[in-house]
């Protein structure tokens, strides 16, 4: 692996490090794994790239000029048996998915990683995002989650392709 840079998002057991700052965070309820599987509740180890940023335009301003608004019909396919697995799709969509436009604020701002993307291996996990946490350090289904203001601070300074390092 190439040496770490201050612009890398580095996940440690207790925090996420970025630009010399440490942010408390949450990770998968089942810890970290090198062998990620759909629904296992683990955060995949490795070096991932941030390949997209989504935001709810009815709730927050775009934090960066490359952020894309989440529309009412936007979904993320989590059906390993379908060709759109681990891709953003639109309703109506009859296969397994999760809504990106949620009633709660968890996906008001989302950083999309390249875990198992763009050519997904079926069953190897989907929707590995960096998003707002439910409550302090409350485990996720495999994503990395942060306090709302910390997530926005990071998003305002992040560049496309930044690395998320999970060790």
Name each region found by the language model.
Residues 146:
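A conserved hydrophobic position in a structured secondary element of the catalytic/binding core
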Residues 143:
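Short cysteine clusters
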């Amino acid at each position: 692996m190439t040496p770490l840079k201050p612009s890398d998002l580095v996940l440690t057991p207790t925090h996420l490090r970025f630009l010399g700052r440490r942010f408390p965070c949450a990770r998968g309820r089942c810890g970290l794994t090198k062998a990620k599987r759909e629904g296992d509740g683990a955060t995949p180890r490795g070096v991932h790239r941030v390949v997209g940023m989504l935001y709810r335009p009815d709730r927050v301003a775009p934090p960066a000029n490359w952020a894309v608004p989440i529309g009412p019909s936007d979904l993320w396919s989590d059906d390993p048996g379908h060709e759109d697995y681990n891709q953003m799709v639109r309703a109506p969509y009859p296969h397994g998915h999760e809504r990106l436009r949620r009633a709660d604020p968890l996906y008001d701002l989302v950083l999309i990683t390249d875990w198992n993307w763009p050519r997904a291996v079926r069953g190897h996990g989907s929707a590995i995002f960096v998003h707002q946490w439910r409550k302090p350090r409350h485990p996720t289904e495999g994503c990395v989650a942060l306090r709302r203001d910390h997530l926005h601070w990071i998003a305002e300074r992040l560049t496309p392709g930044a690395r998320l390092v999970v060790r």
